[in-house]
């Protein structure tokens, strides 16, 4: 017996079947075959052996002759091949063999929930089910999926299951019938067996993939014809010495196999592979009365035509008929064509006058004919009742008008170069007398990075061009320490010496403002013989300030003056530092604040909130990289809500537990015995001060603004960012420890930093009114203001700013 005959008989043993690659394993039910019924007759075996033995001379004469030689034998054994290829086992007469009852869908769903696809685990013997039969069915489901996953060395023996004794047999089943030396040439193979061995094996793989995707008998036949044509090309090329004989051998085997299959299927219909579509027979009453119309339209499977509900009858085995389940359009079946095609195809008229308007071939109109005509494609269905009947048609949804205004995101990035000073710590303030509370400041070297102000991110033009409703959604700063410089005198007196190896420390901090221990100040005076010791302070400087200790403002400092109307444009030194990439100074430094005679117990430990570095080890390193997303980053006046509807004065609205008024907390200063916090309410208003949305206002405004007419808000403040060079002592030969002499001699020191600043601004200009000249929004997105102005130049309390007055000159 040949290899192919043995393989075919092996595959025909009871209990075996070929599993298509695309079939879901959990939906495959392997039933038992029952008794050992022989499936192959000697005629079928002889046909297979003789087909495999056909040589090149016979192929040269034509494959049709070889197939025709055994056509009778192949037809008589068509049920054998159908059983082997599909797993639907029958006897030689085509009668189905007794099979085990299929596992119910309920059991499958239960199995999916228990095992979750993991069949490597043991079956839970203690599982409690309603009936013993359910447990048996669940065990069958479990064992079946283990076999499919290759987790079982042998099939469980017993009634209802065929078995294999080794993993080798299981692997052979997955492999299917393949020609030696090939991976895909043969029926029933998986699609993932690796790279094909040669060109004919590649053609066989493409043929298998076409099978896997086939949904109709036409697609199956097309795949077969394509493969046979390619196989014949390989044979001809081999005869002309254009290809190797190996390709010709494989091509011959493949062509004979497919040719044999096609010969069988001419009598039995397509039996392999199993396709999803099922043909339906046309109702006999339409076959008789619409015969000519059907003949004219069946070539395109009645594409785009609304067919009567009873046009087809019971399902039959799929054959070469061009009409299939897929050609019938139901009302709930989605299609790609537009609504204009639904029922819009008029049936053509034939030469004999028979048409869907009057399908009766005799010309006599009966009640049945009228009923059929009313359901006919292209006719006014139901017109006899006074209107168009849309039964069976797809629902047509009319598109609604909609304007998507979208949101524009713009990113503004700047690169600044700053110089900072190694300022000494010094306690400054007026002299206190008696029990009077006197202000005290202790200066630090921590320079403030003003990242809460817009000029760090954008120039005046960029700000002015932003439309109403623009808001910052994210801002980021990166602080890179470049290096530091320590200066000393080389011709000093005998009491001072120059030193080249001083230690220089660098300090950074994020969020000091939330501590509430201090404030940022600008230094206005220094000790005459010690320029690193500040002696006087004033409020921090951001905007232009006039006077001897004034400041031209961040905009002019970074970007220069306007050449059209700024008198300072031509002044010496008023050049734009950012525009030319040069260094400028940071104006404000952090100071701790305290009052005397308040019983607070001295200065808190600021150092525990600082990060300190040896400056020699962090040159050209990014020491701070922080991002902040404002909760209310509105930087332009908000969009308006245009009140319409009746009445425009809405009256009193019940809002439940929503807050209508903004809440405030009145905090009384120490001592502890007199501290108190009381609640205050503030009405919301749509009146906005002019300076609330200028370029120098703080980005975060959640303490001031409220989204919507009521609701809950949790305001927050933007954390501060500081960096500083610690003061470097000036060493002397004097006895500094004598009489506890204070260390008040400092070497001039400076640091150089780069600040990369970036902010993202969102803008949108929606409108709901066709003639509105400004953008508008709905009430829920309208911004209201609390009639209270927190002061960010003061110290925070519990993470928020109060509305106290700014500290004056100290």
Swiss-Prot record:
One Pfam family of this chain: Denso_VP4
Keywords: Capsid protein, Clathrin-mediated endocytosis of virus by host, Host-virus interaction, T=1 icosahedral capsid protein, Viral attachment to host cell, Viral penetration into host cytoplasm, Viral penetration via permeabilization of host membrane, Virion, Virus endocytosis by host, Virus entry into host cell
SUPFAM superfamilies: ssDNA viruses (SSF88645)
Matching InterPro entries: Capsid/spike_ssDNA_virus, Capsid_VP4_densovirus, Phospholipase_A2-like
Compositionally skewed regions (Polar residues) per UniProt: 348-366
UniProt GO BP: clathrin-dependent endocytosis of virus by host cell; symbiont entry into host cell via permeabilization of host membrane; virion attachment to host cell
Protein name, per record: Capsid protein VP1
Encoding gene, per UniProt annotation: VP
């Amino acid at each position: 017996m040949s290899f192919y005959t043995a393989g075919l008989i092996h595959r025909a043993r009871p209990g075996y079947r070929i599993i298509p690659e695309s079939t879901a394993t959990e939906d495959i039910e392997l039933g038992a075959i029952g008794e050992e019924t022989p499936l192959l007759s000697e005629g079928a075996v002889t046909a297979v052996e003789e087909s495999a033995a056909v040589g090149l001379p016979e192929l040269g004469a034509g494959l049709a002759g070889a197939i025709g030689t055994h056509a009778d034998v192949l037809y008589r054994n068509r049920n054998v091949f159908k059983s082997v290829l599909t797993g639907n086992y029958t006897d030689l007469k085509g009668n189905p063999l007794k099979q085990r009852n299929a596992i119910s869908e309920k059991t499958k769903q239960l199995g999916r929930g228990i095992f979750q696809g993991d069949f490597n685990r043991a079956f839970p013997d203690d599982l409690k089910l309603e009936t013993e039969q359910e447990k048996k069915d669940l065990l069958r489901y479990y064992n079946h999926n283990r076999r499919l996953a290759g987790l079982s060395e042998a099939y469980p023996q017993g009634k209802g299951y065929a078995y294999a004794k080794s993993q080798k047999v299981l692997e052979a089943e997955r492999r299917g019938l393949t020609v030696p030396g090939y991976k895909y040439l043969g029926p029933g193979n998986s699609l993932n067996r690796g790279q094909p061995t040669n060109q004919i094996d590649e053609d066989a793989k493409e043929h298998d993939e076409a099978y896997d995707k086939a949904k109709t008998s036409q697609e199956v036949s097309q795949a077969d014809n394509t493969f046979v044509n390619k196989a014949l090309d390989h044979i001809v090329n081999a005869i002309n010495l254009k290809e190797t004989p190996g390709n010709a051998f494989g091509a011959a085997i493949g062509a004979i196999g497919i040719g044999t299959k096609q010969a069988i299927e001419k009598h039995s219909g397509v039996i392999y592979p199993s396709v999803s579509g099922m043909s339906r027979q046309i109702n006999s009453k339409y076959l008789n009365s619409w015969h000519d119309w059907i003949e004219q339209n069946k070539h395109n499977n009645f594409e785009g035509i609304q067919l009567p509900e009873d046009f087809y009858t019971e399902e039959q085995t799929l054959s070469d008929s061009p009409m299939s389940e897929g050609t019938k359009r139901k009302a709930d079946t989605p299609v790609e064509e537009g609504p204009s095609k639904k029922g819009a195809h008029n049936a053509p008229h034939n030469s004999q006058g028979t048409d869907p308007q009057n399908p009766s071939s005799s010309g006599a109109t009966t009640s049945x004919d009228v009923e059929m005509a009313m359901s006919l494609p292209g006719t006014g269905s139901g017109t006899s009742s006074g209107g168009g009947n849309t039964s069976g048609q797809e629902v047509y949804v009319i598109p609604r008008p909609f304007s998507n205004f979208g949101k524009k995101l713009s990113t503004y990035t700047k690169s600044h170069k700053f110089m900072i000073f190694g300022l000494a710590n010094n306690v400054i303030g007026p002299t206190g007398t008696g029990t009077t509370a006197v202000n005290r400041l202790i200066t630090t070297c921590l320079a403030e990075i003003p990242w809460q102000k817009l000029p760090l991110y954008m120039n005046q033009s960029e700000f002015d061009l932003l439309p109403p409703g623009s808001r910052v959604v994210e801002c980021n700063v990166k602080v890179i320490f470049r290096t530091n410089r320590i200066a000393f005198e080389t011709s000093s007196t005998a009491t001072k010496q120059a030193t080249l190896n001083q230690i220089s420390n660098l300090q950074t901090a994020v969020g000091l403002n939330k501590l509430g221990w201090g404030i940022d100040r600008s230094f206005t005076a220094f000790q005459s013989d010690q320029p690193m010791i500040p002696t006087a302070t004033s409020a921090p400087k951001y905007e232009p300030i006039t006077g001897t200790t004034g400041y031209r403002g961040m905009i002019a400092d970074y970007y220069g003056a306007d050449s059209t109307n700024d008198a300072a444009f031509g002044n010496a030194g008023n050049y734009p530092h950012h525009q030319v990439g040069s260094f400028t100074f940071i104006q404000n430094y952090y100071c701790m604040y305290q009052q005397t005679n308040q019983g607070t117990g001295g200065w808190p430990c600021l150092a525990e909130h600082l990060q300190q570095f040896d400056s020699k080890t962090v040159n050209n390193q990014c020491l701070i990289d922080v991002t902040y997303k404002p909760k209310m980053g509105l930087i332009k006046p908000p969009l308006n809500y245009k009140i319409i509807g009746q009445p425009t004065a809405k009256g009193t609205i019940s809002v439940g537990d929503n807050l209508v008024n903004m809440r405030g907390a009145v905090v009384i200063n120490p001592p502890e015995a007199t501290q108190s916090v009381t609640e205050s309410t503030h009405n919301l208003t749509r009146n906005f001060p002019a300076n609330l949305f200028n370029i120098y206002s703080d980005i975060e405004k959640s303490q001031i603004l409220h989204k919507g007419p009521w609701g809950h808000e949790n305001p927050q403040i933007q954390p501060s960012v500081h960096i500083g060079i610690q003061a470097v002592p000036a060493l002397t030969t004097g006895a500094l420890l004598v009489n506890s002499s204070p260390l008040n001699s400092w070497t001039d020191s400076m640091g150089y930093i780069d600040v990369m600043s970036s902010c993202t601004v969102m803008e949108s200009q929606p409108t709901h009114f066709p003639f509105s000249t400004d953008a508008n929004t709905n009430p829920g997105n309208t911004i209201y203001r609390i009639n209270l102005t927190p002061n960010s130049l003061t110290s925070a309390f519990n993470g928020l700013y109060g509305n106290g007055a700014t500290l004056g000159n100290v």
